[in-house]
A protein has these predicted regions:
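N-terminal secretory signal peptides that target proteins for export/translocation
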Residues: 1-4
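Boundary at the C-terminal end of the N-terminal hydrophobic targeting segment
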Residues: 21-26
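Hydrophobic helical h-region of N-terminal Sec-dependent signal peptides
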Residues: 10, 14-19
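Aromatic/basic-lined ligand-recognition segments
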Residues: 80-104, 195-219, 287, 291-299
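Compact, glycine/acidic-enriched structural inserts
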Residues: 144-189
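A contiguous, surface-oriented mixed alpha/beta subdomain in the mid-to-C-terminal portion of proteins
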Residues: 180-261, 265
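Internal mixed beta-strand/loop scaffold within catalytic domains of large alpha/beta enzymes
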Residues: 78-150
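Gly/Pro-rich turn-and-neighbor structural signature
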Residues: 27-111, 225-229, 243-251, 258-287
Length: 301
């Protein structure tokens, strides 16, 4: 695992180094024309980061699968936002799904008007019940008053995930926290204890391992160089380290009890998305968008 962690951090450094290239997903009426020069630079880097993550994470999953059995992209547009969905499937990484939203105007009172807004969310569903399930998100927004914010969440739904693997993912995040001189405690506490406070119906809230971190629910981070590097690095470290463990565990035997835990986990995630999460249950993104990107490949009732 130590060699894998060094490999992950080396790949992370590469990702950080290349994210200054020209923006991806940039189109007319993209919102960047309403930003000053510094804001445009961060917006462009965030757009490029999205492309970098797609290439890295879908590529890593495809390598584990020995090639995806399918890889589909879809775009959905309405008056509030454009949604870009990509879903790939295979024998080991059963489903990896991504949703990017480009927001034009609020659809709910829990949103603020923006001049630029991007949400990048990615879920990984492993075939093996020993791997749990990853839900991750990172967002950059500039508001009409000229301020900006970074946020995100890094969730591991436990299922039958193994302690050794969860420790590996947790350590990968701790490397980034330490590098940037930040205390992980308040961010980790939100996934360990208090995130249910934001749930529409707390009894359906996702059951998370005390491994990841949440950067929502605080005064969100302002957009500056240090915060941008921290957020993009920790996001990449989380998903990539999970895929490392998935590759190492792909041929491990499992029991009927493990399968039952996976089935319960997937049902819990479905309930969370329909009844607990304010964004999905509140209709901010259409069901056919977030359902395609984030829901498990199979849920049993």
């Amino acid at each position: 695992m130590a060699n894998q962690l060094r490999h992950s951090m080396a790949a992370l450094s590469l990702c950080t180094a290349v994210m200054f290239a020209g923006p991806a997903f940039a189109e007319p009426n993209d919102g960047v024309e309403g930003l000053n020069a510094e804001q445009q630079a961060f917006a462009g880097r965030f757009l490029q980061f999205q492309d970098d993550m797609d290439e890295k994470l879908f590529g890593q999953a495809g390598k584990i699968n020995g090639g995806h059995s399918s890889d589909v992209k879809e775009t959905t547009k309405d008056q509030y936002a454009d949604f870009y969905v990509r879903v790939a499937r295979g024998d080991v990484v059963e489903k990896i799904g991504r949703m990017i939203s480009r927001v034009y105007k609020p659809k709910s009172d829990i949103q603020r008007p923006t001049t630029f807004g991007r949400y990048y969310g990615l879920d990984v569903h492993a075939k093996s019940p020993l791997m749990g399930h990853v839900h991750s998100a990172i967002v950059l927004q500039y508001y009409t008053d000229g301020t900006g914010a970074l946020g995100g969440t890094l969730n591991l739904l436990k299922g039958a995930a193994q302690e050794e693997d969860m420790k590996y993912v947790k350590n990968a995040l701790d490397v980034v926290f330490e590098k940037h001189g930040r205390d992980p405690t308040p961010y980790r506490n939100r996934v360990c204890n208090s995130a249910q406070e934001d749930s529409v119906q707390p009894k359906y809230h996702r059951k998370l391992a005390c491994v990841g971190a949440s950067f929502f629910g605080f005064p969100m981070m302002e957009v500056n160089e240090e915060n941008f590097l921290f957020m993009t690095e920790i996001y990449a470290a989380f998903v990539s380290s999970y895929l490392d463990t998935l590759e190492g565990r792909k041929d491990a035997p499992y029991t009927d009890e493990d399968v039952a835990k996976q089935e319960a986990m997937r049902l819990n995630w479905l309930e969370d998305q329909f009844l607990g999460d304010p964004y999905s249950s509140g209709g901010i993104a259409p069901y056919d968008v977030w359902g395609h990107a984030f829901l498990p490949p199979l849920v049993k009732f």
